[in-house]
Design a protein with these regions (language model features):
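Positively charged n-region of N-terminal signal peptides that target proteins for export
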Residues: 1-4
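Bacterial N-terminal signal peptides
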Residues: 6-15
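Short acidic-hydrophobic, aromatic-tinged amphipathic segments that line or gate anion-handling sites
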Residues: 158, 215-218
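Extracytoplasmic thiol/disulfide redox context detector
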Residues: 19-156, 170-173, 181-205, 210, ...
Length: 230
């Protein structure tokens, strides 16, 4: 998936691997701490009691205030920046889940948003872990085509299914091709889901947003424990 825009709270990037040369070629002195920014190619670096923002190469350094437009506050410490990159309050984005027409698994009071690709093995493992938790949680499943043309076809079949419960069952058991399709299918929810994934910077699945806003980029080893914050 391609990113729609470099927005704060998108997917964090891989860690910087050459910290020593970076300190040599930049105006930053001793590096006391570093956090990956959810912005392409940038890190937040703490040095001598102040925070600056540095390109991955170390060539460019920006001195200023980082403001999170989604949560409407400045981020003034590495801990705040780290938390901003690892949590997500979808309500602050004005996002209505009904507009995305998610597949639903469970009937619990706690809502969990899950982006999956129907052809993703780790996504299926995640959904298996979700099945015993459906009394406590409601999993709102948003299929996105990460793995190519076959995924695009299956996502469309899920989105255009006449029966949403049948679509959820088909996703779980891998029989998407047997779904009865709605000839007058509305493609808007699928398009909105894709745009939402791009805005959030989702580059891989599964991507999970817990009921308390914590993010998991990938499948937790123990879904139940992760949802409980353990």
């Amino acid at each position: 998936m391609r990113k729609l825009s470099p927005i704060i709270l998108a997917l964090a990037l891989s860690p910087l691997v050459q910290a020593e040369p970076v300190s040599e070629v930049s105006p930053v002195g001793k590096i006391d701490g570093m956090v990956s920014l959810p912005v392409t190619g940038m890190k937040a670096v703490e040095s001598n009691g102040r925070i600056v923002f540095m390109s991955d190469s170390g060539r460019f350094v920006i001195d200023g205030t980082l403001y999170d437009a989604w949560s409407k506050k400045p981020l003034t410490s590495l801990e705040e920046i780290r938390e901003a990159g690892n949590t997500l309050d979808l309500s602050r984005l004005g996002l209505k889940m009904d507009d995305l027409n998610p597949l639903t698994l469970g009937e619990g009071k706690k809502k969990v948003v899950v982006f999956v690709d129907p052809r993703c093995p780790h996504c299926h493992e995640l959904l298996k872990q979700a099945l015993p938790l459906t009394k406590e949680y409601t999993f709102q499943i948003l299929p996105v085509p990460v793995l190519g043309p076959d995924s695009e076809r299956q996502v469309r079949q899920l989105g255009c299914a006449r029966d949403k419960k049948a679509a959820t069952d088909a996703l779980l058991n891998g029989r998407i091709g047997n779904l009865e399709q709605d000839d007058a299918c509305n493609l808007e929810p699928m398009q909105r889901t894709l745009v939402t994934a791009q805005i959030l910077g989702i580059q891989g699945v599964p991507f999970i947003v817990a009921n308390d806003g914590r993010i998991s980029r990938g499948r937790p080893n123990d879904l139940s424990a992760w949802l409980e914050g353990r």
